[in-house]
Amino acid sequence: MGKLLKIVSGLVLLIVGAAIVAPRVIDPNDYREQIQTVVKEKTGRDLAINGDLSLSLFPWIGIGLNDVSLSNAVGFKAAPFAKIQEANVKVKLLPLLSQHVEVSTVILKGMSLNLEKNQAGKTNWDDLMHPSTEPNATQDKPIEQSSTLAMGAIAIGGLQIVDANITWDDASKGEHYTLAGLDLTTDALSLGSPMGVELALTVDSRKPKATVGLKLNGDLVINSTFDQFDFQGMTLVLDAAGNAVPEGAMTIEMTSHLIADLSDGGSLTLNPLTIKFDDSTLSGNAAINHFAKPSIQFDLAVDAINLDRYRPKPTDTESSAQTTSVAPPPLAVALIPVQTLRDLNIEGIFKAQSLILKGLTGEEVSVKLVTKNGVLKSEQGVKKFYNGSYVGETVVDARQNTPKIIVTEQVTNINIEPLLIDLLGESPITGVANITAALTTRGNTVPAFKSALNGTAE
């Protein structure tokens, strides 16, 4: 036994000694041309290694790259397909002997990736994805079963991505998006334990013209099978600007506890959930189950919201056209998406302390929505509505090919004058209104609604 230990100790010392001496003797930069030649043969692309290559073997097996780029595919832009200013990754040597993998913090700086699709629908990475047609002697050999490391035996010191940029240019659709300044930093990855995550990036779009800045942080827990993600203390901030953004600019701040489960059909929960935007604060919870055929639940409340701020505003051309002639909508157009309604499974409650819509103000607003098996039911109420109140219920039954609609509404003690002033800017009449309506109809077009309309209103 003693002799065996001496032999093993000698081998270990020999390996360690070689690992220490090798990087001093071997310069990876001497193999720069060979590496570039192999890449050219395998991909047809030019690999440019303009910076130094570094190599270490003990106590970490590591490699470092500086200023490396890969040329674009033939027929696309002259800019490189990919470029990296600096990359470093290291694996600890001695733990490998006991089948444990310890990876240092993975560092990636200044990465640029240009993704393109031409008018024919071909992308600039198609040539990299297609397998080689050359015969491979190893393809006919049976694949041997190899032992795999359990994820618990792998430890990663963290991830650091600095100033990454990705461009997407689709000539077939006229789309152009840029993801710029991506910074991602994580703590050490330990499955089952919280890992701090910080992410920041900016997305630019040409059509529609918009810019969105994103900042995300929190503690992420990942299970050993990588199908459950628990994001604790998650904070997301979005700064959006552009023609499609209400008022031209908007900031959204969201805090939540997010749990995503990709097993058993998948689920996503946000509980609790708080969203701040403009002068409003939305709070509550939301969940989605079974991604293939979603079941959605929510319970949300907002303190105050002006929905007119988020309604699309007519352009100058549209406003001019409306003053000259108003074209009625096509009468035969289907108004209810029957199949979509049949597929929906939604149950939720929305409340607002104060809500403005089309200039009208309501307080203590509530909407209860249930959609299941092709039947949509909405119960809505406004407890304070121009010195009165409003309650209503709407049912859309799309189980048959011809939808059926039932509407019941009751308005009590509404002061007409201030309501019409808010709605129209003036009020030719005054007084108090009490209205009760119970209406039914069938069909899916305006003429069908009018033809089948039945009920009372008083």
Regions found by a protein language model. Name each.
Residues E41-D67:
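Short extracytoplasmic
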Residues A87:
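An amphipathic, basic-hydrophobic helix/alpha-beta surface used to engage anionic
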Residues M1-G44:
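N-terminal type II signal-anchor transmembrane helix
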Residues I84:
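Phosphate/ribose-recognition catalytic cores of enzymes acting on nucleotide-derived substrates
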Residues G17, W60-F81, V103-H130, G158-N165, ...:
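Small-residue helix/turn framework positions
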Residues L128-T148, K313-Q339:
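Intrinsically disordered, low-complexity segments enriched in small/polar residues
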Residues V91-L97:
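A glycine-/polar-enriched beta->alpha junction
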